[in-house]
Amino acid sequence: MALSFSLLMAVLVLSYKSICSLGCDLPQTHSLGNRRALILLAQMGRISHFSCLKDRYDFGFPQEVFDGNQFQKAQAISAFHEMIQQTFNLFSTKDSSAAWDETLLDKFYIELFQQLNDLEACVTQEVGVEEIALMNEDSILAVRKYFQRITLYLMGKKYSPCAWEVVRAEIMRSFSFSTNLQKGLRRKD
């Protein structure tokens, strides 16, 4: 799906805002971003959960990656970033754009893009660019494998409306888990 001019302009403005902002307030930023993303995901639902019960699937969400007791702030930021990047990639496909209302999907893209920018600024501030890749390989790999399972599920179900509904609910669940980690980090600060 080609992104509309207005969407691209909004992304440009949000990028500029992120670059110009100083400091990293992960708990505040991530909590608000997650809340907005969850609201948009809820609005995107087109069919009843009950009509898709037969399509439910356990994607094996890597809960250990989002356990607030095991992570330092920089590691958590890196895990959040990967989850949001993979969510953006998943919902940016041609098959995804056919499944959802275009206006809501554009708003969801913008929200995810804003969160990615905020998290990139935070992770760079917390640990520096060189250390990011080495620090969190296992957790990033776990998140990538999780999203690979989601993608394979969608392919196996031929991107059916119920398959997308199951995935939408799963992504909402994953955003809720990351919110719990964020709360744990707030208690540590």
Curated annotation (Swiss-Prot):
Residues 1-23 form the signal peptide. The keyword Oxidoreductase does not apply. Keywords: Antiviral defense, Cytokine, Disulfide bond, Secreted, Signal. It comes from the Eukaryota. GO terms for cellular component: extracellular region; extracellular space. Pfam families: Interferon. It is found in: Secreted. Its main location: secreted. SMART domains: IFabd (SM00076). GO terms for biological process: adaptive immune response; B cell activation involved in immune response; cellular response to virus; defense response to virus; humoral immune response; natural killer cell activation involved in immune response; response to exogenous dsRNA; T cell activation involved in immune response. One of its GO terms (molecular function) is cytokine activity. Disulfide bonds join 24-122, 52-162. CDD domains: IFab. The keyword Disulfide bond applies. Produced by macrophages, IFN-alpha have antiviral activities. Interferon stimulates the production of two enzymes: a protein kinase and an oligoadenylate synthetase. PANTHER family: INTERFERON ALPHA-16, TYPE I INTERFERON. Belongs to the alpha/beta interferon family. This is Interferon alpha-16.
